[in-house]
Amino acid sequence: LITTIAGNLFELQPLSGIRLLDLRLPTAFAERYAGPKFGMQGTRAFAGVPERPLIGTIIKPSVGLSADATGALVADLCAGGIDFIKDDELQADGPACPFEDRVKSTMRAVNAAADKTGKKAMVAFNLTGEIDEMRRRHDLVLDYGGTCVMVNLTGVGMSGMIDIGRHTELPIHAHRAGWGALTRDPLLGWSYPAWSKLWRLAGADHMHV
């Protein structure tokens, strides 16, 4: 599909600009893909926020915090009543903050706050990696009581997104790192509705904007 709608069309030299604005997919084609497993309603159920807007934040600095420092920051955020916390897209499994250590420290803080207040913050842990790695990381998050995972779309590619979408038992937060390269020129590239439809079809429950 991507090769057909956004392949060599962009290489046609006589065109000074070409932009993909939207997609209308035949029902029979769209139904071949599962799409989001949870969507907004499922995400709200996991987050315990049935109606109002979710209040969220991103762990900063992007990289450099240890797993313990990340857990301490998450504890403060939970004490403040946050609904949604996500890893920065640069934070995956680096030496300063290994993925498994970060999950353990973060979920310790989340679960302790939930025991006190009855409110369990949703944390989107960045799984981005090779397919087998992402599956293992997803399972680790699930084992520690996590309620969300995250992938960098351009990093894992369409096949990676489809695979983790089939495997997941948790909502997937999809990060659009690199999106600017596809859309900054108003006469060239993709519109966000067209681009996001493909990733939703592949299994993304919500898109970072």
Predicted regions and their residues:
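Phosphate-binding glycine-rich loops and their immediate beta-loop-alpha structural context
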Residues: 57, 64-91, 97-98, 110, ...
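Active-site mouth loops of central-metabolism enzymes
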Residues: 53-71, 121-132, 179-190
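Catalytic alpha/beta core domains of metabolic enzymes, predominantly
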Residues: 135-138, 144-209
